[in-house]
Amino acid sequence: MATAVSRPCAGRSRDILWRVLGWRIVASIVWSVLFLPICTTVFIIFSRIDLFHPIQWLSDSFSDLYSSYVIFYFLLLSVVIIIISIFNVEFYAVVPSIPCSRLALIGKIIHPQQLMHSFIHAAMGMVMAWCAAVITQGQYSFLVVPCTGTNSFGSPAAQTCLNEYHLFFLLTGAFMGYSYSLLYFVNNMNYLPFPIIQQYKFLRFRRSLLLLVKHSCVESLFLVRNFCILYYFLGYIPKAWISTAMNLHIDEQVHRPLDTVSGLLNLSLLYHVWLCGVFLLTTWYVSWILFKIYATEAHVFPVQPPFAEGSDECLPKVLNSNPPPIIKYLALQDLMLLSQYSPSRRQEVFSLSQPGGHPHNWTAISRECLNLLNGMTQKLILYQEAAATNGRVSSSYPVEPKKLNSPEETAFQTPKSSQMPRPSVPPLVKTSLFSSKLSTPDVVSPFGTPFGSSVMNRMAGIFDVNTCYGSPQSPQLIRRGPRLWTSASDQQMTEFSNPSPSTSISAEGKTMRQPSVIYSWIQNKREQIKNFLSKRVLIMYFFSKHPEASIQAVFSDAQMHIWALEGLSHLVAASFTEDRFGVVQTTLPAILNTLLTLQEAVDKYFKLPHASSKPPRISGSLVDTSYKTLRFAFRASLKTAIYRITTTFGEHLNAVQASAEHQKRLQQFLEFKE
């Protein structure tokens, strides 16, 4: 039954994904192919450069441009660009994958999907290098050439020889294709950063074009250098294999072998290979840039569908369903934009249903925003729990964060003073927040995100407590003083050592048994092995966790939380004058409670020893690294959202029922002391 229900959901997800992104994908591919003739023309002109005869140089270049063989290779290059664009579509991600250790980075690179990506790009790079070598003409055009020397008996040689220059071109293209794929995942180039300021697509492309060409020229130079070093040591292997397989001779009388220093110092060869690399990287980066521009363009989701058939694409339905992650991001981006710039659409959010008079639109939108923000609070609490226990969270038992209550119990109920959760969470983790379920194999994800299981598989390694924050347990660490927080493993061991009627009696009425001698012996041996391995430098080099990567992983999906903050706060501020039915007033206490609790969790996070308080300076580069500073943008957006509400409502917020801690914190915002 579950499978039958999930199939229609998957079908609806594919339908909405195609309706929203289908034309964008097609348009980006078409423009990538249309940009190819410009790149090909520039490549032909620079490959035949002759500064002493400029008129002859330009006339020959344009005459070759219209020749039949160039048109054929142009069609072949178009197929390559389409394949590269398809891989851009298949491997994109709205949440960057951040490995927390060098071993995790290696595992990310050798993943089967990544290996397939690298193999295809190496093959496409070889095809593009072959086309570039043939278009260049001259001594680089053919792999097999007639030998010019004589045989050992003194008669003219009739054999065919291997053209090592052409082989060098092909191998360089394969190397550049593989390097592009490797850097594609190492630098998170599949990550789609959404622009902060909405601009026209042409302006975004024009702004990136000069940086793209500069990046391609520099990267091609470094890749040619790396390949020359590699070919110097290992170039004889492919040369000997191809000459043996094709029964070709190697003519060393005309051209020096390229696996020597003198052979590699051929400036003409290096120039044409570098130019081929620039051509390859530029065309691939253009398709990549165009897909990013089209995929991250704002999309308008109707708040109220004009027809019943279009209800699946309305904003409240998309936010509360389980759409593909990019659709979720586009919906939250649209919520942020409508809350600021569209009074008519805000009225649709505040409207009541007919008949019935229920604020379904506001209820659905605010519920999802509060769930996202509560999920971020839970994630920060989990991270602080791991940091407080020196990165040690028990792997014997799954740790499950407290599930968010239903909206009827939390988000849409005016909190009583006796029922308000304490905003200051020292101890930041309460015993009811994490529960050890020994018989449940599944662990509830701490993300609190609306993404499906397939997306979570793609996000594997982004936030894994045992992966990112684990550290070898040593007796010195275990014997440290009293800790600020309580982990599930400590609670479990306390229950073993100090049994009480509430903990020693199971649900079936049976007494829990003490740990056996075998179990204690296994645990002791495991600790000894960990201590032994932690003293080995090479092992710790691969297994040690990078604190900055762990911090970035916590806020890797913070962009949608930023949009939820901005959208919710702008709607609440606008409701002061635009909400005719008072639908926002019923949820205002819950919204303030969520924001203030999250604010306290963020403040406690930034007070951790390894959490930097200032964003690093990011230089302008083609590869986007804005995800590294999302935590600072999230902190600023959260504080701005609270100030936006307090400055709008002013002293009216004193009538909102809240706990004493929240009232004190709210007063600081009202007095601009926060």
Curated annotation (Swiss-Prot):
- Sequence positions bearing Phosphoserine: 406, 439, 445, 471, 474
Q: Which residues cross the membrane?
A: 25-45, 69-89, 115-135, 166-186, 226-246, 273-293
User: Main localisation, per the record?
Assistant: nucleus
Per the UniProt topology annotation, the Perinuclear space ranges are: 46-68, 136-165, 247-272
Query: Which stretches are Cytoplasmic in the membrane topology?
Result: 1-24, 90-114, 187-225, 294-674
What segments bear the compositional bias annotation Polar residues? 407-421
Q: Where found in the cell? A: Nucleus, Nuclear pore complex; Nucleus membrane
Residue ranges that the Swiss-Prot or TrEMBL entry lists as coiled coil: none
GO annotations of cellular component type: actin cytoskeleton; cytoplasm; membrane; nuclear envelope; nuclear membrane; nuclear pore; nuclear pore transmembrane ring; plasma membrane
Alphabetized InterPro entries for the sequence: Nucleoporin_prot_Ndc1/Nup
Q: Which domain of life is it from?
A: Eukaryota
Question: What membrane topology term does the record carry?
Answer: Multi-pass membrane protein
GO:BP terms for this protein? homologous chromosome pairing at meiosis; mRNA transport; nuclear pore complex assembly; nuclear pore localization; nuclear pore organization; nucleocytoplasmic transport; protein transport; spermatogenesis
GO MF term (any one):
structural constituent of nuclear pore
Q: Name the segments for region: Disordered.
A: 394-425
Phosphothreonine found at: 414, 440, 449
Keywords, comma-separated and alphabetical = Membrane, mRNA transport, Nuclear pore complex, Nucleus, Phosphoprotein, Protein transport, Translocation, Transmembrane, Transmembrane helix, Transport
- Biological function: Component of the nuclear pore complex (NPC), which plays a key role in de novo assembly and insertion of NPC in the nuclear envelope. Required for NPC and nuclear envelope assembly, possibly by forming a link between the nuclear envelope membrane and soluble nucleoporins, thereby anchoring the NPC in the membrane.
Q: How does it assemble?
A: Interacts with the NUP35/NUP53. Interacts with AAAS, anchoring it to the nuclear envelope.
Q: What else is known?
A: Depletion of NDC1 from HeLa cells interferes with the assembly of phenylalanine-glycine (FG) repeat Nups into nuclear pore complexes.
The entry's family comment says:
Belongs to the NDC1 family.
Name of the protein: Nucleoporin NDC1
- Species of origin: Homo sapiens
Record gene name: NDC1
